[in-house]
Amino acid sequence: MKEKAHQVYRTRGGVVVPSVTQVIGILNKPLLVNWANKLGLQGIDVRKYVDNKAEIGTVAHRMILDYFLDQETDFSEYSKEVIDKAENSFLSFLEWTKDREVKPLFVEKSMISEVESFGGTFDFYGLVDGEKTLIDFKTGNGIYQEYFYQLAGYSILLEEAGLNVRKGMILNIPRTEDERFLVQSVDSLEREKKIFRHLLSIYWLEREVKG
C-alpha cells in the first residue's frame, strides 16, 4: 500500500490536466517553513518526524475511507506503532459520527472537468444530517485556508456533473496526543472557487511559459 501511483487525469481528448492538489500546490506555504525551522531549533529531525506522522495519517485516512467503502486494506507493511496510533485516530473519527447521520453518495471518487480542464479525487460527498456535504479528511496539526480552496476545486467538479454542494467540511483527525480533533464547515465556497480558478489560470500560464 505504501507505493501509490500518481493519479493522471486526462480529458476525453487525451489531454493531461492538473489535479486539484497540483493547482493548490502553486501557493507558497510559509507556515510550513516556519514550522520546520522550529523543529530544527529543538533538535528534532524534521524528515523522520514528518515521515512517521505521515504514515500514521496515511493509514488513518485509509481506515476512514475503508469504513465507508466497507472494505479492508492490508496494513502489514506498517509498524505496529503506526497502526495502533492510526486506529486511535480512526476511533476519534467514529466518535464524531455517533451524533450525526452520515450517508455517503460517493467516496474516493475521481472526476475530470472537461470544461475547465482539471481533475481530482475527493474523499466524501454525501448526506450529513440530511445536507449534501463535501468532506475532506485531514490528519495534521491544524486546518488551513488552502484546504477550502481544495474543497472548492472538488465542488466545481461535482457541480459540472450536476451535483450540488450545500456544505463544505474539513475534518482534521489527530494522529498523536499533541494534535486536536478539529471540524470547520462553510455554507458557501463561492469565494474559494474564484481563488481556485485564478490558481488554475496561473497553472496553465506557467505551463505555457515552461513549455
Where are these regions (language model features)?
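Metal-dependent nuclease catalytic cores that hydrolyze phosphodiester bonds in DNA/RNA
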Residues: 1-119, 211
